[in-house]
Each structure stands twice: as structure tokens, then as C-alpha cells.
């Protein structure tokens, strides 16, 4: 696979490769961007988010359908991001705080978005409700100052591993705060970031730009580094 570069988002550095908690595989940085909200005419940045995909598995899987597409084509196509979310390869998401958040603030917002999406799609059951409760429980005792990180490993069988870091590193052998077996939740957490109504359009643009380069390199056998994608709000 072609080499990839690091990405810096608001002073937060996402290295080109990570080995996430709960995984035996290296993951490459697919893209990164801010998550923010418009408040009284000002764009307030809350978190920097990096999305990593399993080396040796993600690019060949995505190439079957998306090889030859430009960055703009990928960025505009909800089906591309759906394939990233549901693809048969591991994903790893690192959420690093720009502003402080409590665990309850973060997990309440994520589960609220997930439950709303499930109910709208008619797929909400007691199993999803129980998974959302486990997710909130894992976050309850934690608070996240600027620079602290939340680490999600999304496995193809549908296990969401949750871990925490006091900084932007991914600690070797990090102990998971929770491993939640629920495919809907495992996919929904990532979908809430890069899906059709994802909270980080900047991360989506970055992923589209970088993955289109990697797909091009895969098809031509080129090993040049993926171009660093501009990451703006």
C-alpha cells in the first residue's frame, strides 16, 4: 500500500499509522478533521477526529467499487462513506478534545444521535437500547480535558471497543473501558461522524481526498505518499 502522511488538526497531530486497542492489526490514517458547532455566528471547535482503516484490507475492499473516483466524487457520495462504515475490515477512531467535555456530555450526545437514527430507520430494539446504556456507563466516571482522547475500535463482527488516553497517544496495550457486542452501535458511532449526517464534514473531505489517492496508487502500483489533505473547519 502507498505510504500516508500525518495530518494536523488545530494543533492535534494524527500520525500516519496506529495500532488500536483490541486489535492485532496496524491501521493507516484515512483522514482527520474538526467537529464543531455554529454558535451565535461563531464556529466553535470541540474535538479533532482521526479515522484509521485496517492496513492491507480496507483499500482492496474499497477499490472494488470506488477505484478511479475523484476526491470530489467520493466526498459527495453517501454510499462511499457507508461502505467505509460497514466494510469487512477494522476501523479505528480517535477523538481528541479541543475543549473540555465530561464523559456524560459526550456519551449522551452520541447515544442520542444513534438512537434517533435507529428509530428513524425502524431498527431500534431492546438490544440497541442495552448497548447504548453500556456505552454511557463506560463514560460515566470520566472527564476529558483538552488533549485527552477517546479511542474506538470498530471490528467487522460488530464489537465496539472503547478506551481512553490522557493525551493524543494510543497507548500500547491500552486497557479497554468496554467491549460492546452490538453491530448497530459499532457502526453507528462511526456513521455519526462520517455518515450522511456526520458531525465532521472536515473529516469526510479529508478521507475522500486521501482515500482517492490511495485507490489510485493501488490501481497503478504507485507507492508515493498520499497527499496531505487540507483540513479546515
Swiss-Prot record:
Annotated substrate binding sites: 47, 113, 192
An annotated Gene Ontology molecular function: chalcone isomerase activity
Pathway field: Secondary metabolite biosynthesis; flavonoid biosynthesis
Superkingdom of source: Eukaryota
Note: Part of the biosynthetic pathway for all classes of flavonoids, a large class of secondary plant metabolites, many of which are brightly colored.
Biological function: Catalyzes the intramolecular cyclization of bicyclic chalcones into tricyclic (S)-flavanones. Responsible for the isomerization of 4,2',4',6'-tetrahydroxychalcone (also termed chalcone) into naringenin.
UniProt record similarity statement: Belongs to the chalcone isomerase family.
Protein name: Chalcone--flavanone isomerase
Gene name of this polypeptide: CHI
Amino acid at each position: 500500500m502507498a505510504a500516508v502522511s500525518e495530518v494536523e488538526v488545530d494543533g492535534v497531530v494524527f500520525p500516519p499509522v496506529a495500532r488500536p486497542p483490541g486489535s492485532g492489526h496496524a491501521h493507516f490514517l484515512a483522514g482527520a478533521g474538526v467537529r464543531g458547532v455554529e454558535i451565535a455566528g461563531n464556529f466553535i471547535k470541540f474535538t479533532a477526529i482521526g479515522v484509521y482503516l485496517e492496513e492491507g484490507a480496507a483499500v482492496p475492499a474499497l477499490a472494488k467499487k470506488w477505484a478511479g473516483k475523484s476526491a470530489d466524487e467520493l466526498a459527495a457520495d453517501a454510499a462511499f462513506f457507508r461502505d467505509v462504515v460497514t466494510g469487512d475490515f477494522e476501523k479505528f477512531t480517535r477523538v481528541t478534545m479541543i475543549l473540555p467535555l465530561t464523559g456524560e456530555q459526550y456519551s449522551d450526545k452520541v447515544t442520542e444521535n444513534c438512537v434517533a437514527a435507529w428509530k428513524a430507520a425502524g431498527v431500534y430494539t431492546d438490544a440497541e437500547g442495552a448497548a447504548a446504556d453500556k456505552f454511557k456507563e463506560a463514560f460515566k466516571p470520566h472527564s476529558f480535558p483538552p488533549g485527552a482522547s477517546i479511542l474506538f475500535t470498530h471490528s467487522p463482527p460488530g464489537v465496539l471497543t472503547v478506551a481512553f488516553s490522557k493525551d493524543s497517544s494510543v497507548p500500547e496495550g491500552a486497557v479497554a473501558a468496554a467491549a460492546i457486542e452490538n453491530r448497530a452501535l459499532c457502526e453507528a458511532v462511526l456513521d455519526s461522524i462520517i455518515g450522511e449526517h456526520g458531525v465532521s464534514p472536515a473529516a469526510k473531505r479529508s478521507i475522500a481526498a486521501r482515500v482517492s489517492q490511495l485507490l489510485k496508487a493501488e490501481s497503478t502500483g504507485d507507492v508515493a505518499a498520499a497527499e496531505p489533505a487540507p483540513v479546515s473547519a
